[in-house]
Amino acid sequence: FLYFCVSKQNSAMIEEMLAYNREFVKNEGYKEYITNKYPDKKIAILSCMDTRLTALLPAALGIKNGDVKMIKNAGGVISHPFGSVIRSLLVAIFELGVEEIMVIAHSDCGACHMHSEEMLEKMKARGINADYIHMMSFCGVDFHSWLDGFEDTEKSVRGTVDFIVHHPLIPSD
């Protein structure tokens, strides 16, 4: 694996993970996970990045490594018509043979009831310069639509599915 950490120096937790990885590679622990890049079930799943879903979602769906393309983000939503989620779906469809897309949500999602104003205040409290936030707003970034969560999980999933179904670059077949 190739890895770079965002922080200036690795935390003890990251160092522990990297040490584990070195042993994992040395002992060839990866061999049981070897597969190719094409999903066997020809399915892409858009879901939330919630840590509770890491092992639970594959177990609940009966999928294993190599079965599907998993795309995860906060809330399992599409926040931009030409952002990274749509790009990932296009790559999955046109380059990796995906034929079906599932959108999966879960209860007690952290993106549910998320409010942009609260997040902007947390950013400022962590040292993000208010001038940068203002500059991004001036450049056309609508923080409210970008950072706000959703109030109704089912409505959010239906909206995301509708967005995908009607996207001009997603094939209708």
Outline where the language-model segments fall.
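Ordered, amphipathic secondary-structure segments that act as subunit-interaction surfaces
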Residues: F94-H106
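Conserved beta-strand-loop surface patch within small alpha/beta domains used
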Residues: N27, K31-I86
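Divalent-metal-activated hydrolytic enzyme cores
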Residues: N10-K41, G76-G83, E95-L96, A111-D173
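Short secondary-structure capping micro-motifs at structural edges
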Residues: R87-I93
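Gly/Ser/Thr-rich loops at beta-strand to alpha-helix junctions
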Residues: M49-R52, S107-A111
